[in-house]
């Protein structure tokens, strides 16, 4: 079967975008040589198209064809890696969405060629100049327990908060040491607040956040009922709290306040908050 015969329209024959349900290798090669980009794009979308044909189509001159390759779950990782450098922003965006979506189902085997190439592709995309590409990775991988650690750390250090924030707040891949390193590095505005909102912030992280002096991050920390704040760390907060009104209500609502802390809070909060405090201690 030739591409020319299959794609001719007169006499009720298949339109250019329609291909047989099952494709032989010879048919796929013939369609790949078609002068009609709609045929090549249909081939790039086809679930039966062989990996080597998809790799060939990944270098097609038509963006429509390359985008179809980027979106195809059957595309070999070698072709995906090639497309990470594509000049079309939309193609890299679609590629990022696909690879990030497939990553949770990937077997974490460092010896696997597929795993290694997937990590390489993710690392390239995590440094993409287009914020939306990096944001797609962060949003999709933020709660994936087995996401590649280096990729997650790259996203966590991103210079754009919309990329870094979801990973900093939710990723189980980041260790306490990773988070301490980020806190001490003087990250972008909003990064510490994202860490403060994590579930189960440990005492050392809370102390580092408080030592940073970031008022928004400290407010978020106080508002996080699952965050561990040691008494000595709370004392540092209380030393500055009279002049920071945004801390007052979350301080009043902190779980397990000591009598000493309660007395200090009572000395500076407004009357309506004092009533709440008295009901709690």
Which residues fall in each region the model found?
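Alpha-helical scaffold segments
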Residues: 1-281
């Amino acid at each position: 079967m030739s591409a020319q015969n299959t794609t001719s329209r007169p006499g009720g024959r298949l339109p250019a975008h329609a291909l047989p349900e099952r494709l032989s290798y010879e048919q796929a090669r013939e369609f790949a040589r078609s002068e009609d980009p709609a045929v090549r794009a249909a081939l790039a979308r086809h679930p039966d198209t062989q990996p080597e044909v998809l790799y060939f189509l990944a270098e097609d001159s038509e963006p429509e064809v390359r985008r179809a390759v980027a979106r195809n779950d059957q595309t070999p990782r070698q072709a995906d890696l090639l497309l990470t450098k594509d000049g079309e922003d939309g193609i890299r965006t679609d590629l990022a969405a696909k690879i990030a979506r497939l990553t949770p189902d990937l077997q974490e085997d460092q010896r696997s060629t597929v795993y290694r190439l997937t990590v390489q592709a993710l690392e390239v995309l995590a440094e993409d100049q287009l914020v939306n590409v990096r944001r797609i990775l962060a949003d999709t991988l933020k709660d994936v327990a087995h996401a590649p650690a280096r990729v997650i750390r790259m996203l966590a250090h991103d210079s754009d908060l919309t990329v870094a924030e979801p990973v900093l707040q939710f990723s189980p891949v980041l260790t306490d040491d990773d988070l301490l390193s980020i806190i001490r590095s003087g990250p972008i505005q909003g990064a510490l607040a994202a860490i403060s909102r994590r579930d189960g912030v440990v005492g050392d992280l809370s102390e580092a956040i408080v030592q940073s002096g970031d008022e928004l991050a400290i407010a978020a920390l106080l508002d996080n009922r699952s965050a561990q704040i040691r008494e000595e760390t709370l004392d540092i907060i209380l030393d500055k709290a009279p002049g920071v009104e945004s801390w007052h209500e979350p301080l009043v609502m902190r779980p397990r306040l000591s009598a000493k802390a309660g007395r200090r809070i009572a000395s500076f909060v407004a009357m309506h908050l004092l009533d709440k405090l008295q009901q709690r201690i």
